[in-house]
Regions:
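Hydrophobic anchor at the beta1->P-loop junction of P-loop NTPases
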Residues: 7
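The conserved Walker
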Residues: 11
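Conserved glycine(s) of the Walker
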Residues: 14
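A conserved segment at the C-terminal end of the G1
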Residues: 17-30
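Short beta-strand-centered segment that lines the nucleotide-binding/catalytic pocket of NTP-utilizing
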Residues: 29-43, 52
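Conserved nucleotide-sensing/catalytic segment adjacent to the nucleotide-binding pocket
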Residues: 42-100
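Conserved phosphate-donor/acceptor-positioning beta-strand/loop module used by diverse small-molecule
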Residues: 97-98, 116-138
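Small-molecule kinase domains that catalyze NTP-dependent phosphoryl transfer to phosphate-bearing small molecules
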Residues: 143-186, 190
Length: 221
């Protein structure tokens, strides 16, 4: 039976960064990695971890916003896909991202998840302390596919969304608020009681190109 780990937050709330760190940690410990439908299957000490997403050109993992199942982006379709991965590969942990505005969905009730092989649910609401910090992060990350009003609305209703999940009052469930500014190895500490301070966020393609340009200019000089 599997544990469903869903990290919720607006765009640019560093969800993918934390999951990328967790993947890199597992690989540093000798985990094997297999590319499977919709993501990656990592195996360490006979425990299987499925990360739903894809990798960018710089090698960094990115989650839900990559929409690895193409048009199949509804919650029911995603959960059915997770059930398929659990059945076919014997997955023990499913790591995925979500947005604040889907957190009250009935699709996350245990009555829908348990038939898929999910017996434990861990929800983490990863957010900045203030709306201003959230909007500034999106500005710095040049997020263009999220409407500002939608971000503000979701942020203001964050506590209501959390309460909806808590009110389900179902067993084997964690609902926790996490600062987007916590260490990148937060989930390494949470699930492995370990740390991974050597993790570095991969440079973006733009940063790599700029660094190469600077190197060429220095050589010419």
């Amino acid at each position: 039976m599997a544990t469903y780990v869903n990290i919720k937050g607006s765009n640019a709330s560093r969800k993918s960064t934390k999951l990328d760190c967790l993947m890199k940690y597992l690989l540093s410990k000798g985990a094997t990695e297999e590319t499977v439908e919709g993501g990656y299957l990592l195996t360490l000490n006979d425990v299987k971890y499925y990360f739903f997403g894809k990798k960018r050109k710089n090698g960094m993992f990115t989650g839900l916003d990559s929409n690895p199942l193409g048009s199949r982006n509804g919650m029911r379709e995603r959960h059915e896909h997770f059930g398929k991965m659990i059945k076919e590969y014997g997955v023990d942990y499913v790591f995925t991202e979500g947005y604040f505005n889907n957190s009250g969905s009935n699709q996350e009730k245990m009555e829908f998840l348990k038939p898929l092989g999910i017996t434990h649910r861990h929800f983490y609401f990863q957010t900045f302390d203030t709306l201003e910090e959230q909007l500034e992060s999106q500005r710095k990350r040049k997020v263009t596919n999220t409407d500002k009003k939608r971000t503000i609305n979701a942020f203001n209703k964050l506590n209501d969304r959390m309460k909806q999940l808590q009110d389900y009052n179902e067993p084997n469930t964690i609902t926790e608020k996490v600062s987007a500014l916590v260490e990148n190895d937060f989930y390494v500490k949470k699930y492995f009681n370990d740390s991974y301070p050597e993790y570095e966020i991969p440079k973006s393609i733009e940063e790599i190109k700029e660094a190469e340009k600077t190197k060429i200019n220095e050589d010419e000089w």
